[in-house]
């Protein structure tokens, strides 16, 4: 049976307080700007799960050089999620899958849950299919991304209203 769709009602002013995220990994920190105006459900979901500690200690279970580093599966296999799913936000989302983008992983339209991926390179064939909800903000973050290997650990995710 498919998990139920979850809809968040977090106000934009509240999301603005979490406009920047840092994914702390065993390879270093990856600072992100989150596109809360373009993908409010994806950002609300990511922020809520992260604040609950959902991502703490999970691994990057799928890392493909020249493609993506994917994490957020509670089983570390790519088969799990948070027990709910969210709708894709692609129709009015101007953001593209560029090097350093963070996007929702899913197994088909409106099946995203907790899994996300970071793009090693531009991936235009994913535009309109997956919800881009942020981007890496610094060369340092991109350098850390390039060091991520399969099995590396997401230690925690923290948020702030500014860089």
From Swiss-Prot:
Residues 17-163 form the PPIase cyclophilin-type domain. It comes from Helicobacter pylori (strain ATCC 700392 / 26695) (Campylobacter pylori). CDD domains: cyclophilin. One of its GO terms (molecular function) is peptidyl-prolyl cis-trans isomerase activity. Signal peptide: none annotated. This is Peptidyl-prolyl cis-trans isomerase. Gene3D superfamilies: Cyclophilin-like. InterPro entries: Cyclophilin-like_dom_sf (IPR029000), Cyclophilin-type_PPIase (IPR024936), Cyclophilin-type_PPIase_CS (IPR020892), Cyclophilin-type_PPIase_dom (IPR002130), Cyclophilin_A-like (IPR044666). Keywords: Isomerase, Rotamase. The keyword Transcription regulation does not apply. It catalyses: [protein]-peptidylproline (omega=180) = [protein]-peptidylproline (omega=0). One of its GO terms (biological process) is protein folding. The gene is ppiA. It comes from the Bacteria. Its EC number is 5.2.1.8. Belongs to the cyclophilin-type PPIase family.
């Amino acid at each position: 049976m498919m998990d139920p769709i979850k809809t968040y009602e977090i106000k934009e002013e509240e999301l603005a307080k979490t406009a920047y995220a840092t994914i702390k990994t065993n390879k270093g920190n990856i600072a992100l700007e989150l596109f809360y105006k373009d993908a409010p459900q994806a950002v609300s979901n990511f922020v809520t799960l992260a604040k609950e500690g959902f991502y703490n200690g999970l691994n990057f279970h799928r890392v493909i050089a020249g493609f993506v580093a994917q994490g957020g599966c509670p089983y570390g296999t790519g088969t799990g999620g948070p027990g709910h799913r969210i709708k894709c936000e692609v129709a009015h989302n101007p953001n593209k899958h560029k090097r350093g983008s963070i996007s929702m992983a899913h197994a088909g339209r409106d099946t995203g849950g907790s899994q996300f991926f970071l793009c090693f390179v531009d991936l235009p064939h994913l535009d309109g299919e997956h919800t881009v909800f942020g981007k890496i903000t610094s060369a340092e973050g991109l350098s850390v991304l390039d060091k991520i290997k399969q099995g590396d650990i997401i230690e925690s995710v923290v948020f702030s209203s500014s860089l």
